[in-house]
């Protein structure tokens, strides 16, 4: 059986870049890594409805620069940027370092795999027929400009006694081609029957 590899990690240095960009000596490396995880966790918890596909972190000396990619920049910025300033201060308390925040707008959320996975999870949580949900989401992504999409949902679909896997594929999704711009996202849907895992692969070109 073929071994599974994370599509983003597999392409770092080819079509993808590191989500954390900094250098550290042996003594500080683990501390910085844990700090990055705390920052990401905090952002996703506080802004869970802001449609954030990814958070990138850069460090230069003591300064920590956080790039937040979002489909809803208005939710993050607030009136006259007050929300961003409040949030930056919270992150400075969390890290004990000066923090600079940059909000980057995502213009086509239908082509961001993690946002598509979250949309599917939300629909499955409302007990919508999974086949209909997958087809609708796939059609929207293809219409937005995606070359191909693959969706996999697993768990007790439609409240079935035994868990099973539902798949939907449209267009080309070359997982083994390194130069292919492939985006990957995962989300968990919570239903009365239990948790359902949603995985999405989107081929952008």
Where are the predicted features?
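RNA-contacting regions in translation and RNA-metabolism proteins
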Residues: 1-205
């Amino acid at each position: 059986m073929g071994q599974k590899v994370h599509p983003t990690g597999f392409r770092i240095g080819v079509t993808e870049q590191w989500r954390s960009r900094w250098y550290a000596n042996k003594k500080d490396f683990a501390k910085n890594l844990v700090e990055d995880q705390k920052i990401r966790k905090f952002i996703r918890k506080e802004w869970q409805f802001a449609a954030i596909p990814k958070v990138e972190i850069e460090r230069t000396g003591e300064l920590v620069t956080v790039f937040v990619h979002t489909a809803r920049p208005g939710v993050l910025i607030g009136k006259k940027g007050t929300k961003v300033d409040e949030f930056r201060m919270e992150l400075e308390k969390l890290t004990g370092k000066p923090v600079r925040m940059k909000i980057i707008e995502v213009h086509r959320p239908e082509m961001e795999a993690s946002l598509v996975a979250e949309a599917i999870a939300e629909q499955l949580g409302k007990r919508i027929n999974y086949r209909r949900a997958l087809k609708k989401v796939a059609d929207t992504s293809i219409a937005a400009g995606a070359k191909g999409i693959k969706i996999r949902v697993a768990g007790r679909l439609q409240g079935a006694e035994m868990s099973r896997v539902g798949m939907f594929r449209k267009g080309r999704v070359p997982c083994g081609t390194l130069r292919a711009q492939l985006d990957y996202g995962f989300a968990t849907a919570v239903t009365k029957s239990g948790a359902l895992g949603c995985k999405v692969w989107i081929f952008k070109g």
